[in-house]
A protein has these predicted regions:
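Cysteine-centered catalytic environments shared across enzyme families
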Residues: 1-301, 323, 327
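Short, amphipathic alpha-helical segments that act as regulatory/interfacial helices
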Residues: 6-9, 100, 104, 315-321, ...
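Short, surface-exposed acidic
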Residues: 31, 90-95, 406, 422-436, ...
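An alpha-helix initiation/capping motif
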Residues: 96-97, 101, 116, 204, ...
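Amphipathic alpha-helical segments that form well-ordered structural scaffolds
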Residues: 98, 209, 213, 270, ...
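Peripheral terminal appendages
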Residues: 157-160, 200-201, 208-209, 213-224, ...
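ATP-dependent adenylate-handling ligase core
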Residues: 259-317, 323, 340-354, 374, ...
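Mid-to-C-terminal catalytic subdomains of enzymes
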Residues: 326-355, 363-474
Length: 528
């Protein structure tokens, strides 16, 4: 990952800019630079991924314009060729160098052209103004706010803006900002039509698009690794990558508790099958408890399930950073939002299933995508998410929801069937029931966190303290514990997150008071 910061106005202070940018130094430990545009500043912390030389350092400048971008542009070679045909020249191998030529040629229409995950802030000399934009899913983070004098700031993380802005707001995915307005250029959750097809043709399309999504994300000048939980999604990503890169073993990592890890054996089975160089990170109860506060500080959220699931990811990424030269990690996020969680088995009809999928994609930047970004970036690594490939997401979201519902006796059947003949991973893994990530790391992880919360507050203290919050009021001692840690680092900024992630409680079988799939009546053998 990298970090970007735009302090957009003549009232901007260089010293304040410097201190704010330093707060996300771990996102980009290789180099740091601040550019004075004459009307504010653009700042960049670099984690070198494409073109590791100094030529790839940002901000990029051209004809008085300037840009900083935290992103990966997967079609940059094709776009570069088009620009070169028009006479543009380039001095680096960085994918982001083409952004200013694109701006000169296409203006705001450039954002729709990008097959990318990105957050950027661009200074336009002609108008002496700033333009900001974020990818359609929100895989790369971006926040904004105004300082006490009303000067606008954009930043990779809310921590850059704490103490500067009284209100910090997530930049809406699929939008660009210009002249005081946020304009949607692509909405991945606005589905006006759906398409059908027979099962085999649909699964063939899913297969080819996911393989393409993995292939794009293997393109890196820095070493690549893989998070392998042993569940379907990460195992498929690893299996596809192993077939695409047969010349050398993948490097894979998994994590589990020292007492009751569920997924370690499954991850080991996949690693043996694909022949990866596999590493296991074993953690204790104390590791979990010690990680809680730094995890919430990194996440910038109080959401229960996001915090739980982040503990394992944070600790495994810390181990990767400390023991290897890997810079890029491929992960399995976003599959659940597209094909369904355990709770979506209870969707009353196809329309309800589709509406829930649209909601999950619309809000994913506050939950699973946020978790992957922060836990990985705080350890100076970059996350890449093949299931978040724009063509893949667009195709699946437009599929007839009847096809995606669990009519097959097992969830996510379309993905499973799509790869049934490839034999990329063991069939036992391909057809394995889903387990929640925090549960898969170890059932005791959730239990240990709840025990800590129960020991922290009496019932009277819980009632008194939770009553102090008028937004997203804590409803368990665990949720209160997370909220109080959040407020320590992000005071008064709770509205950055829309609500607690929970199953759709209006559906039969989903009226629960905990986000864990373990409390659902259909959890069955998922946790075995």
């Amino acid at each position: 990952m990298c970090a970007i910061l735009g302090y957009c106005g003549r009232g901007a202070s260089y010293e304040v800019m410097q201190k704010a940018l330093q707060k996300t130094a771990t996102r980009g430990p290789d180099d740091s630079r601040i550019l004075d545009t004459g009307n504010g500043f653009l700042g960049f912390n670099r984690l070198a991924i494409m073109d590791l030389s100094d030529a790839g350092m940002q901000p990029f400048t051209r004809n008085g314009n300037a840009v900083v971008c935290n992103g990966e542009i997967y079609d940059f070679r094709e776009l570069k060729e088009l620009l070169e045909e028009d006479g543009y020249t380039f001095t680096s191998g960085s994918d982001c160098e083409l952004l200013l030529p694109l701006w000169e040629k296409y203006g705001v229409h450039m954002f729709r052209m990008l097959d990318a995950e990105f957050a950027m802030v661009l200074y336009d000399k002609a108008s002496d103004s700033y333009i900001a934009a974020r990818d359609p899913i929100g895989i790369r983070p971006l926040y904004y706010g105004k300082d006490a004098e009303g000067t606008l700031l954009f930043a990779s993380e809310p921590k850059n803006l704490v103490g500067l802005c009284s209100k910090i707001t997530p930049f809406p995915p699929g939008h660009y900002y210009r002249d005081g307005k946020f304009i949607c250029y692509r909405n991945m959750s606005a589905i006006s039509y759906t398409t059908g097809g027979n099962l085999d043709s649909v699964c063939a399309a899913i297969h080819d698009r996911l393989v393409s999504g993995v292939r794009k994300r293997l393109d890196s000048d820095a070493p690549v690794g893989f998070l392998l939980s042993g569940g379907l999604d990460s195992s498929l990503v690893c299996g596809i990558a192993a077939k695409l890169m047969p010349e050398k073993p993948l490097r894979t990592w998994s994590i589990g508790m020292d007492v009751d890890a569920i997924d370690l054996k499954y991850a080991r089975e996949v690693a043996d099958y694909i022949g990866s160089e596999h590493h296991e990170v074993i953690i204790s109860k104390q590791d979990v408890l010690d990680a809680l506060e730094p995890v919430i500080a990194a996440l910038g959220t109080w959401d229960i399930t996001t915090v739980r699931a982040s503990i394992g990811m944070y600790l495994v990424c810390r181990a990767i950073h400390e023991t290897s030269d890997v810079r890029v990690l491929l992960t399995g996020e976003i599959s659940d939002e597209l094909f369904g969680y355990k709770y979506t088995d209870f969707a009353p009809d196809a329309k309800a299933f589709q509406q829930e999928a649209e909601k999950r994609i619309r809000e994913i930047h506050m939950y699973d995508v946020l978790r992957a970004d922060r836990c990985i970036a705080v350890n100076s690594l970059e996350a890449r998410v093949p299931f978040g490939d724009l063509e893949f997401v667009d195709y699946v979201m437009h599929l007839d929801p009847e096809l995606k519902m669990n009519h097959y006796g097992i969830g996510k059947y379309l993905v499973r069937h799509a790869f049934e003949e490839d034999e990329l991973i063991p069939r036992s893994i391909l057809m394995r029931e889903k387990a929640a990530f925090s549960d898969a790391v170890g059932h005791s992880l959730k239990d240990d966190l709840q025990e800590l919360a129960e020991q922290t507050y009496t019932e009277e203290e819980f009632e008194k303290k939770s009553a102090e919050y008028d937004f997203a009021k804590p409803f368990t001692r665990e949720s209160l514990l997370y909220r109080e840690i959040f407020e320590k680092y992000y005071p008064g900024q709770a509205r950055m997150v829309a609500d607690f992630w929970m199953p759709n409680r209006s559906w039969p079988g989903c009226d629960v008071n905990d986000p864990s799939a373990r409390v659902l009546p259909n959890y069955g053998k998922s946790g075995e």
